[in-house]
Amino acid sequence: MVKFPFMKIQMMMGMKIKENELFEKLKSFFPDLVQSSQFDSWDCFTAKHNTVIELKCRNVHYDELIIERIKWDALAHKRASEALGTIYVCWTPKGTWAWNLGSINAPEWHIKRLPRTTEHLARDWINKEVGYLHIDQATRVKLPE
């Protein structure tokens, strides 16, 4: 199982990083980390730890961070069908948290109106099924500068 060091929370107030920057910082923990294809349901993979990792960068910090059910289900399927570990890593302005999704229960699901994608300026809003992961269930990750 993948373990991140328990360290002081990293404060990056006023800074926003992108998923590709988060990926590069995580390579200090997983030197063999490789990005997935754009068609995969996760962002990267470490063969040494036999684990797929999903990355999210949020502009605002909440103690409960959102995960879409479609993402949870895809990662759960990957975990069950290929015996892989599944980690969800979320960066916020107040720090970075990692959840080992195989060691926690699925969250309670809710319908929430959200943008179809956050990658484009034109936002098409749709209903999405989402759950919330509390940071108390996660490991705080101290990223390199």
What are these regions (language model features)?
Residues 69-83:
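Basic, amphipathic alpha-helical patches used to engage nucleic acids or provide basic targeting signals
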Residues 97-145:
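Intrinsically disordered, low-complexity terminal regions enriched in charged/polar residues
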Residues 35, 52-54, 87-90:
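A structural signal for short, well-ordered beta-strand segments and their strand-loop junctions
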Residues 59-73:
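Active-site-adjacent loop/helix micro-motif of nuclease/hydrolase catalytic cores
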Residues 44-61:
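Conserved catalytic cores of phosphodiester-cleaving nucleases, focusing on short active-site segments
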Residues 79-105:
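Nucleic-acid nuclease catalytic cores
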Residues 1-38, 81, 96:
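Acidic-basic catalytic patches of nuclease active cores, encompassing PD-(D/E)XK
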